[in-house]
Amino acid sequence: MRNKKAPQTVSARHDAREHLSIEAYHKLNRASAVSRFVGGDLIHRELSGLHQLYIPHIFSYLNEDIDFVLNELKAKGLCRDFLAQQKDRGDRTHV
């Protein structure tokens, strides 16, 4: 007799592990989409004064979204092992 386990859907998964919030997930997706768009825009357009107006705002939005997700990951302890390794090495980069 085989021990078959039914595949779990996301809604059926209720375990003790910490998970990213839906807001953090959306912020990561938005940051990814915006950075992809800006990268493509900068490659295909001639630089003009308009870029100087909108690029600082875009990077500010990206920073806010990524900072939100990183702080959530740290608060949930999902970066605990990595941060401990950095602390042991004395590396303070990106903490």
From Swiss-Prot:
Question: What keywords are assigned to this protein?
Answer: Early protein
| Record gene name | Epsilon
Protein name per its UniProtKB record: Derepression protein
Report the function annotation for this chain. Required for derepression (induction) of the P2 prophage helper by P4.
